[in-house]
């Protein structure tokens, strides 16, 4: 298809999954702006083999310097201290490690002086300074 045919088809079918790379949701574009990584480098519809991509977008996608990894958590069990992580990032490394579980320190430390006395204390200090100088 030519670029004109792609745009004509996608203008008429904006909800077609093959056109989502040309017409992404505003939230997808916003994520790309926030992460400073163009959406077409990581957005799944742009990676589809049947995606309708004009030549300029294909050229931009070819410049993406991104390692796209799919990481999924498998069996997560806190009682056995076992964490199974599946990392599909072209690595063949399989690691089995025991993870020690400990509770977070939730000790609450209160200030020595209540904050409501701060303005009164500052006012008293100012009066003392003015009285003696």
Swiss-Prot record:
What are the record keywords, sorted? Answer: Fusion of virus membrane with host cell membrane, Fusion of virus membrane with host membrane, Membrane, Signal-anchor, Transmembrane, Transmembrane helix, Viral envelope protein, Viral penetration into host cytoplasm, Virion, Virus entry into host cell
| Gene Ontology biological-process entries | fusion of virus membrane with host plasma membrane; symbiont entry into host cell
Residue ranges annotated as Virion surface topological domain: 1-111
UniProt subcellular location: Virion membrane
Sorted alphabetically, the Gene Ontology cellular component annotations on this record are: membrane; viral envelope; virion membrane
**For this UniProt entry, which segments traverse the membrane?**
112-132
Mode of membrane association: Single-pass membrane protein
Primary subcellular site in the record, as a coarse category? virion
Role: Envelope protein part of the entry-fusion complex responsible for the virus membrane fusion with host cell membrane during virus entry. Also plays a role in cell-cell fusion (syncytium formation).
Its family remark reads:
Belongs to the orthopoxvirus OPG104 family.
Q: What is this protein called?
A: Protein OPG104
